[in-house]
Amino acid sequence: MPEKAGKGKIGNTNFNVTDPDGHTVEIVQYEPDSWTRREKGKYIPATRISTHMAHVGVMVGVLDPAMKFYHDILGFQEFWRGSASGKVLSWVNMRVPDGDDYLEFMLYSTPPDAAQMGTKNHVCLFTPNIEKAVATLEARPARKNYRRPIEIKIGVNGKRQANLFDPDGTRIELMEPNTTDGKPVAPSTVPAPK
């Protein structure tokens, strides 16, 4: 951690650190006189698909160093674990210290190539009704330039979701905030990848 944090170009106090997997993590304090506070809400149209960025998903190779960094140093709290196979852990969700947003660790045992990293690392946007959100996207003029299908699926976490990819291949996940049956999915107890 730096001894002193500087002010960024838009007036917020910030600094960067690198996590154990090489991801740059920017720590930001929104200042009262910053562009962020001054312009809050001005560029958000009523036609937007989402009003809340729920989480960011990042690839993690070894769970213990990531837990030490995000939990022990930054104060994130684990609240759910999931497994795609039922044999080895796939995800660990870590809530920020002072809110409901979270970081999703996506665990791997074999390092992914650059193309896989781009489709795995992602931003998740909450939408209250995934069917309505997808219908809105399908009706937009820009849809004719987006060649991939937009499919609604139910994730291991029991929530309906759809994935889109920006022109660089980065995944954008749209997800409903609640499970399909209104009950939380029990966390997985299987071991992390080796």
Which residue ranges define each predicted feature?
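Eukaryotic phosphotyrosine signaling hubs
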Residues: 54, 120-121
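Short hydrophobic/aromatic beta-strand micro-patches
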Residues: 59, 124-126
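Amphipathic alpha-helical segments
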Residues: 62-80
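Flexible internal linker/loop segments at domain or repeat junctions
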Residues: 103-110
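Short amphipathic alpha-helices within nucleic acid-binding modules
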Residues: 130-137
